[in-house]
Amino acid sequence: MRNIIMTAALMVALTGTAQAENYDNTTVSMAAESATMGISLSTNDTSRSIDVYTMGRSLDFGAGVSDNGTNRDYSVSVGKTLDVLNVGPVGTYLSGEAEYNWGDTFTKSEMHFTPTVGGKMDLGLIAPYAEVDYMLKSVEGDFTSIDKATPNFTIVTKVALGTSTSLNAKLTNSLNSDWESTDKEVSVGLTVKF
């Protein structure tokens, strides 16, 4: 219980005004996960969202709702992650996700396709990883017309706080089509396994 209270205090400290001045959109999330399913609640400077998802299956599925106080958007997704090469505590992976989006901020529904390549390490209590993804999205209402959206570079450190609780600290660097930095976002998340 003490670890949970300390973690909650750390999350509040990391998302105070000093952090929000340095980055455009600081996110705090909490997730509860079983071996095959999870639910996540998150909030940032502009919106709140809830996501339900599966894990560890041949294909993973998800559904989400995001609300910014004025508009409400919905999404359903399917994805797959493949471990490519694992040597000791170091590994690499490829993943892909297709997401269908609709709601108040979309004139017509659109599809997002996100291929990702990443590297990870498992050091016991600490498990850092880094990944690069490149989102492709359809023109609203025309799923056959695909535009490049944005690449992202993400660095994450996952710290085990106990046997069933972990804290994730994430830095996401959004890039433009020339791979130059356009925005940085910090996220802090607490995950509880049951």
Model-predicted regions and their roles:
Residues 71-74:
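Phosphate/oxyanion-binding active-site loops and adjacent basic polyanion-contact surfaces
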Residues 21, 45, 69, 82-88, ...:
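Outer-membrane beta-barrel transmembrane domain signature
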Residues 16-69:
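Short glycine/proline- and aromatic-enriched beta-strand/turn motifs that initiate or cap beta-hairpins
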Residues 90-95:
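Extracytoplasmic beta-rich ectodomain segments of secreted or membrane-anchored proteins
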Residues 1-2, 9, 25, 36, ...:
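Low-complexity, intrinsically disordered short peptide segments enriched in small/polar/basic residues
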Residues 1-21:
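Gram-negative bacterial Sec-dependent N-terminal signal peptides
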